[in-house]
Amino acid sequence: MLRSHGAGVLRKSDAGQQVTLAGWVSRRRDHGGVIFIDLRDSSGITQAVFREPDVLAQAHRLRAEFCIAVSGVVEIRPEGNANAEIPTGDIEVNATSLTVLGESAPLPFQLDEPAGEELRLKYRYLDLRRDGPGSAIRLRSKVNATARAVLARHDFVEIETPTITRSTPEGARDFLVPARLRPGTFYALPQSPQLFKQLLMVAGMERYYQIAHCYRDEDFRADRQPEFTQLDMEMSFVDAEDVIAISEEILTELWMLIGYHIPAPIPRISYADAMRRFGSDKPDLRFGLELVECTEFFCDTTFRVFQAPYVGAVVMPGGAAQPRRTLDEWQDWAKQRGHRGLAYVLVTDDGTLGGPVAKNFSDAERSRLASHVGAEPGDCIFFSAGPAKSSRALLGAARGEIANRLGLIDPEAWAFVWVVDPPLFERADEATKVGEMAVGSGAWTAVHHAFTSPKPEFEDSIESDPGSVLADAYDIVCNGHEIGSGSVRINRRDIQERVFAVMGLEKAEAEEKFGFLLEAFTFGAPPHGGIAFGWDRTNALLAGMESIREVIAFPKTGGGVDPLTDAPASITAQQRKESGIDTKPKEVE
């Protein structure tokens, strides 16, 4: 080894020891005939002092981020010079030798100062030397080890599934890879290990997991990555309760890494109640502000805007004090989300109603509205009217915006909830409106994925009333973020074919795209279920990071670009020719 100790482990008890440290120059300070270096490695920082003429002369050439090795004697710092802000602050190393292991060019940014994200990502190897980014990646390693330990206790088998496979419709666009040896054909990078893990259950593996890399060619979004990671699990001979139990055990141990004990059992809410009360299938329960149903209240209204299939409201405490300009900005906020605006009523100090909408109400509506929605004098009532799903979603977003503006969210709080019993199907046109891809060509598509089992009591309604069918599914939500999604799976060919048919995948097309899975179901497929945790988001929450990019070693930007390697990049004409990307596939006779 080139060093005897880590820079962050030395203490008073090590005084008098001869040590060799290796790391990077974090700071250099010249004090008239003495040079002080803060030497940093992955374990921390130790101050090295250069007094002896030989090493002092060498130390003059040191600059920030030079990689060096220092030998010397551990000494207790002179009285008054201790640094209580670092664990090694009571000692220093009196250097007797210095070796420069690697010089550093002038830095593109100072590691102890803020820098723009694109610059940080271009020089990510420098960014990760900083305490915050580096600590987040190291925490991720502990998170992986902790999850593996829990699953090992329960006899799970870690199995790697293919990362190049065939393209199958799973709800997003595939990344395609040309198959050189079969010109005109393509592999696809997997959007998830879903099909393979189900086949592993048919294979008798019974308890499977992997930390899986997944790929989705989605439209660019601020906090999405084209390549992401899941903790993927599947179990045979289980129901939803079994999967939820092991999931809660994993989550409990993960959050213990940061000193928080998750109260057990984690509460549950139905999908329908989550949408009705919070306007979201991933509600943030760190604060109140529930939505109020107003459809019946306005059932006889003459106000045409509220003559809608759904009318709802959310109250902003103290919101009546907002200036007109701010209230106008709320309208722009709603329009950015695809709505015409956000109607509002102000409750004045004497309890009367103000604002442009209130004049359209009847006397009876005005007299009872504040009581109905739970508003007090000085509050603002926001409304949305129209189709229930989109109107509730707008109010749910407004609920979160209100909480942020009023400081209602405790940043140190944790709120977990299982959202259960979602619909199995949704209208395909509604899915495509929000950027999702319909699996088939039918009027309905899967809410989760096409392999989710309906709850048994709804099997007879699959064809006759798809919109009423509930899925045997469960999502785990933390602080308004979905961090895991799971379900009991279909394990019967006839049920799977019926679900495909509702989504517009008739037997011939289903056989072409999923024949291998359907055939496997004919060989005694066991009941099975599982869950996949969004590992990047889970790690970001544990590390206290806003963006998942902070917990990925080499992430892409929101535009899907890697500033470090300048990927994606064009290919040469020779590469294009060899790949066969322009070759038409041979017709199957």
Curated annotation (Swiss-Prot):
Instruction: List the residue ranges of the region (Aspartate).
Output: 194-197
Entry keyword annotation includes Transferase: no
Q: Which residues bind L-aspartate?
A: 170, 216, 448, 489
Q: Does the keyword ATP-binding apply?
A: yes
* Reaction equations catalysed: tRNA(Asx) + L-aspartate + ATP = L-aspartyl-tRNA(Asx) + AMP + diphosphate
The record lists the membrane-crossing segments as none
Specify the enzyme's EC class, one word: ligase
What Enzyme Commission number(s) appear in the record?
A: 6.1.1.23
Database matches in Pfam families: GAD (PF02938), tRNA-synt_2 (PF00152), tRNA_anti-codon (PF01336)
Q: Which GO terms describe its cellular component?
A: cytoplasm
Subunit record text: Homodimer.
Protein name per the record: Aspartate--tRNA(Asp/Asn) ligase
